[in-house]
Design a protein with these regions (language model features):
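Intrinsically disordered, low-complexity terminal tails and inter-domain linkers enriched
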Residues: 34-49, 70-96, 272-277, 330-347
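Helical subdomain adjoining the active site within ATP-dependent kinase catalytic cores
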Residues: 340-343, 365-399
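Hydrophobic alpha-helical segments that form the core
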Residues: 197-200, 204, 355-368
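An alpha-helical support segment within catalytic cores of ATP-dependent transferases
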Residues: 16-46, 182-260, 270-273, 347
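ATP-binding pocket architecture of kinase catalytic cores
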Residues: 54-84, 89-202
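Active-site acidic catalytic loop and adjacent metal/ATP-binding pocket
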Residues: 56-69, 99-100, 240-295
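Active-site activation/catalytic loop segments of kinase-like enzymes and analogous catalytic loops
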Residues: 294-337, 359-377
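Actinobacteria-biased recognition of intrinsically disordered, low-complexity terminal regions
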Residues: 1-18, 74-92, 399
Length: 399
């Protein structure tokens, strides 16, 4: 990676404004952006040439820009075209399009380095998520003045939580089983290089220590926020729910590569696959790491929901979703000749108990975030009472 100091801007545009798009086009067409990337192993450096940039979406931490090469641009190298998804579709023959994501929150607030996100994508089965291209973590030497992560584009759109059907749940269960077919030795990030699990601590794993530390952040985040009365009992109840599964986490025998933030907004749908199911892929792997498979299962939704993130599901629907996932994991294990499922998946009762603890953890974290944003965001202000009410009901507390 070589960075020309002259390519680093002296003023950094807001990541969601047209000024950033203009700077992005300039950096791409000059080749400065490509030169700055730490390219993922097996990926080719994106070609230099004319490109159109458009804001594809804004999430809780990142703004995503779509880069569409213009027709005069030479075709991208084969390694950079979008991989064929497991849907029977053919990969595009023309230039690939790309998604470049830039954080609109402080880098210190991100759960992982961007290089670790790219490493996780490189470790995932082909077609589960976007093909990784590369990242640049250092804002001071970035041609945009911001950290960047670049992947191939993924077709499709997120479905509204209220529009999910049983077919969506089955497709998601099968796709998630493919992601979780990658084993991990414990809870921790995926590292670049030849030893992807080098940062996973040895010995018994823990979740409670992480949640206890997060709880201090939740309390700090909502100080002075409007309409946050009653959050302290929710925090205590969430901690108690996690404490009950700590012995399971310490003895768990089947950690996997986990997406870590697999809510509805990070699940894209595009037509149907060869089996006639809705075709699905995942995006935004910034939380990806080795973890308990129950985490991704819980993040979809269930009884605790609100906003665009969580799918409201009955107990019967959750049971069907989990059953489809377990069956898909078993089928993949048979195909691979790897024998029986680990108890972390085969013991469905224990899996469901851990899902309930992960639900308490994840929704409490989101509730604290939503409460901290409610004063400045009408959407977060609207979501706050529903998310708080459904979490309180799940934890057996009055709203």
């Amino acid at each position: 990676m070589l960075v020309d100091p002259a390519s680093v801007p002296t003023a950094v545009p807001d990541p969601v404004t047209p000024a950033l798009g203009d700077l992005l086009v300039s950096a791409w067409e000059s080749g400065a952006l490509q030169a700055a990337l730490d390219v993922s192993p097996g990926a080719a450096t994106p070609p230099v040439g004319p490109v159109r940039a458009e804001l594809a979406g804004v999430g809780e931490s990142f703004a995503a820009w779509r880069l569409a090469p213009l027709p005069s641009m030479p075709s991208a190298p084969t390694a950079m075209t979008r991989p064929t998804a497991p849907t029977g579709k053919t990969a595009p023959t023309g230039p690939a399009s790309f998604i470049l994501r830039v954080p609109h929150v402080p880098v210190s607030a991100l759960p992982r380095s961007l290089a670790q996100e790219i490493a996780a994508l490189a470790h995932a089965p082909t077609g589960v998520g976007p093909a990784p291209v590369g990242a640049h973590d250092d804002a001071s030497t970035s041609p945009l003045g911001l950290p960047v992560v670049l992947t191939a584009d993924v077709p499709g759109a997120a479905a509204r939580p209220s529009s999910w059907t049983s077919a969506h749940l089955r497709s998601h269960a099968h796709h998630l089983a493919r992601l979780h077919s990658v084993p991990a030795p414990g809870r921790g990030p995926v590292m670049p290089g030849p030893e992807p699990w080098a940062a996973v601590p040895a010995g018994p794993q823990s979740l409670l220590t992480e949640v206890e530390a997060e709880a201090e952040g939740w309390r700090a985040a909502v100080i002075g926020a409007p309409d946050v009365s009653g959050l302290e009992p929710l925090i205590d109840a969430a901690l108690a729910r996690v404490a009950r599964i700590e012995p399971q986490i310490a003895q768990l025998d089947g950690f996997v590569l986990s997406h870590g933030d697999l809510c509805a907004t990070n699940i894209l749908w595009d037509g149907v696959d060869v089996a006639g199911r809705p075709a699905v892929q995942y995006i935004d792997f910034e939380w990806a790491q080795g973890d308990d498979p129950a985490r991704d299962l819980a993040n979809l939704g269930g009884s605790v929901h609100g906003g665009p993130w969580y799918v409201p599901l009955t107990e019967e629907q959750v049971a069907g979703f989990v059953g489809a996932y377990v069956d898909a994991r078993a089928a993949l294990a048979r195909e691979a000749g790897s024998g029986e499922l680990p108890d972390s998946v085969a013991d469905v009762g224990a899996l469901r108990e851990r899902m309930r603890a992960w639900t308490a953890y994840d929704r409490m974290a989101m509730l604290a975030h939503v409460a901290s944003r409610a004063a400045e965001s009408e959407m977060h202000r609207r979501v706050l009472p529903q998310l708080r009410g459904t979490l309180a009901a799940e934890l057996g507390l009055p709203d």
